[in-house]
A protein has these predicted regions:
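Active-site neighborhoods and metal-handling regions in enzymes and metal-associated proteins
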Residues: 1-282
Length: 282
């Protein structure tokens, strides 16, 4: 599904645009082209397109969402997305006044960004880009189409933008952390003597998924081995298990580590745990 590119009234900008304007001014940036999933999600108030949640590739190219934001000009903001995102807008309208859900790959997305910059008179502006998240073919198109523009690495500016969390973001981080902790404790209770690392990791994945988190990874050790990769190694009585896992909750990562022992801990382990407790309570 696609909708005709159009312009809507600015309403409910989902971030502190005055602060973003200040950060852009300090970085010498006139207009942003945000292309990473985490920064486009932030600038769109938490939105991400579920179709490309797990994989960006499509055909011979890839998904490239672009948020265009002009310093001091939110009425010139635009979102450039995939053709299928027109339906997303119909159900939950994007805040950006300009919307172009007309892309399948990187080049058509970059071309629409160039066209929009021309319409708002920013062909020769200082344009902030994300070099690590801008495919080379899209970069080359932008560079060729805008020879008078100055392309600036906006990575640090965007990191500073997201550094101060809102109350809503902190709540998501809290929920993400609690979901991961609860999943780990449930997995440790589930595991038995003979449970392999691969089986334990798969159980943790199920626990996190059932609680509403998107499983990212699990690094697991058993006994004296420091190898954290999945394997047929089985948990033995008296061995310590260390689970380090990250799970995604609406774009925010809960990343924690918990430990358990199969059976009763020995005296040495009790002493070590007491030392850890003493440090934590100090």
């Amino acid at each position: 599904m696609n909708i005709v590119p159009g312009k809507n009234a600015v309403s409910n900008i989902p971030f502190d645009h005055a602060r973003v304007d200040r950060l852009m001014e300090e970085a010498g940036i006139d207009v942003l082209l945000a292309t990473s999933k985490h920064n486009t999600q932030y600038l769109l108030g938490g939105y991400k397109f579920i179709f490309f949640a797990a994989r960006d590739a499509i055909g011979h190219s890839r998904y490239l969402p672009i948020v265009v934001y002009e310093k001091g000009g939110p009425d010139h903001a635009a979102y450039i997305g995939n053709r299928m995102e027109g339906g997303e807008h119909q159900n939950n309208p994007f805040w950006t006044p300009n919307l172009h859900t007309a892309c399948w790959g990187t080049l058509d997305a970059a071309n629409l960004a160039v066209e929009h910059l021309g319409k708002i008179g920013k062909q020769a502006a200082r344009i902030g880009i994300e070099p690590g998240f801008l495919p080379s073919d899209a970069y080359a198109l932008i560079r060729h189409a805008l020879p008078d523009a100055k392309l600036i690495d906006a990575t640090d500016m965007l990191e500073r933008m997201r550094a101060i969390k809102t109350d809503a973001e902190l709540e998501k981080l809290r929920i993400a952390s609690e979901l991961i902790t609860d999943s780990m404790l449930a997995t440790i209770r589930w595991a038995r003597e003979g449970s392999t690392k691969a089986e334990i990791i798969e159980q943790l994945r199920r626990e996190e998924t059932n609680r509403g988190a998107h499983f990212e990874y699990c690094l697991l050790t058993l006994g004296s081995s420091h190898n954290r990769a999945a394997s047929p190694q089985a948990w033995k009585k008296g061995e310590v298990m260390s689970i380090d896992s990250g799970g995604n909750y609406h774009g925010y990562i809960g990343d924690l580590c918990r430990m358990g022992v199969l059976g009763e801990p020995d005296a040495e382990l009790e002493d070590l745990l007491a030392e850890v407790e003493a440090v934590q309570q100090a």
